[in-house]
């Protein structure tokens, strides 16, 4: 899609040319002697030099007009950069990676922790198109900490509940059982595992059934059984042993900022990369005795997921339908900008990551800015909005980064400019010094054409044999820096002064808020928002035992009604995200709760929450 600002500049240029030619025609009619000499009487000059002057003037005036109008949106953009930078920055490509571990290369007692932000580079390039030669510049990083295990899924099977009499005795409503059989990735690799942490799985069924499968687990899972390698039930646990991932504060896709509210971050994650929520974890393997095997067998243990609904036959299942050792990865990485000499001739300075190939990199966020003097002394410059700038220190400079649409790139993208101010809030810069910045970058749209199965290698050490993409990278999306959208986003973030309790406006208010997070090309997201038929809110009370205090909280109970025919995806997942968002509207010593309905059918009811904590 062509960038909005370029379209706007073209529109301004056309209007300026039409105005010039129209006025020229009128001028020629009024002053034929002068106009005939200039050949303007027909509104379009036959003299190429005159036409060149007209077009040059129209371009200069339209560009000036665009710059003046863009100034009015800078305040909103700068404020958004401070509080919610992910709403201003472009959205990089994201994917799901599968890690093949070496079970004897590390201590896997409670799982090996692969830190968030671990970098990966592509190897053994598969694609043969023109872009494949540049894939080597791409870098992906893990979004958050991931536990790896020397295990693999051997089989995923639907089984009859009659095969497990113990489960039928424990759960009266059991209808079917989903058995996930685990095996050692290497013989003997699982002998010293303690399983002090839960085991996390990724749902990798056929794309059209992924969210249906998640919906079934969400709504119909009532218990979990743990079986040993011989198939004997060792533990029977309730639904609490099962958890859908992606909702915790430390499970954000994009680099977090302490100022970002979790509810708004989840909305952004959901509408940009919903596959992030296709993870679930199971507890119960802790203290499981691993029998000594007389011969090498790969089977280790199994999970039996107890469901009160039969699994649809149309969902094909095999040993690759559910995977271990997977994690979301994003095309974000740290990179240092090229040095920029500072002088008094320019009031702002453009950051460049690679002057030879500027299209290969785009800045997602500026982390730190440094300056170096002629003696090689380096110092860090503080952000303009930092309290440190107000300290009475000589030669103290503050910096502000501004995102603007690039007119020089072949591909869509933004440029980043740095402006400097002194402690008196006047434009000033560390002249005769050289500046550079530590940034978080992406590769623009380069990674989105990578194929499924592309191999990667970890940059650094780790007990990994290989890394592969199990899903095609999502599309890169350039941020919208239009004036109207920026002010809409900023006003939306003032949600604490907005009420959703008005029955006549609650549904429309919620729809308008969600529209700000959905890309116009995301038809599924658009249909999900359009499926919201009703949002009701009423006052209520809920018991609480937080901190040993027993009593009642006052709060708001929301009821969300969706149109089942319009909605596409997992309604319960959608409701879980909205439940966290609605929690932002609760005040101190109050709660919020959500009940989800599809038409007249009650689907799910979440426990009351105060902030993002469930009331005990």
Regions found by a protein language model. Give the residues of each.
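Extended alpha-helical scaffold and adjacent linker segments that couple domains
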Residues: 5, 88, 96-100, 106, ...
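Short, Φ-rich (hydrophobic/aromatic) sequence segments
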Residues: 53-57, 79, 217, 326-328, ...
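Mixed-charge (acidic/basic) macromolecular-recognition segments
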Residues: 1-34, 38-41, 236-295, 479-518
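Short, low-complexity Pro/Thr/Gly
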Residues: 187-396
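Residues at beta-strand starts and edge strands
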Residues: 93-95, 174-178, 195-197, 220, ...
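C-terminal domain/tail detector
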Residues: 2, 372-616
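Extracellular ectodomain segments of secreted/surface proteins
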Residues: 61-69, 86, 162-196, 318-320, ...
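Extended assembly-interface regions of large multimeric machines
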Residues: 1-230, 236
